[in-house]
């Protein structure tokens, strides 16, 4: 955590890197920019002409991300869109991206998925971060603190869809706080 802003854990970062190197995408979608750390990190494993579109709800974090991206000379490679991802995703064109990194509001992953699938090309990869919720997602609904039950239930639903939707092949990995790697079937 950097100044109270969550960033990707080192072991999760390594898995993300290997997926980028394997896929070699030209168009990447990130949901959950925060201060731009992951977007900037991903550019190190993409070709010079690859583009990242990253979505962030917070105006404050969007401004900080844009500053960080500009300071590192990545503004031509990374586009930051400020707004609710559930809405901004709807504005993105179909079959545009080869890779999606989902690392935003955990209770919203299930709501992002239909549009993520729509904007990804066949053969596209979805990497979902923080899916195990410190192990809570494996617990019974009733053992989870009341304030965390909505996140718990929605994350379980998300994982169920990832592993049961015929359009996807998914692996759930205990890396960092849990990652799912899903491939959109062609």
What is the role of each PLM region?
Residues 10-186:
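S-adenosylmethionine/decaboxylated-SAM
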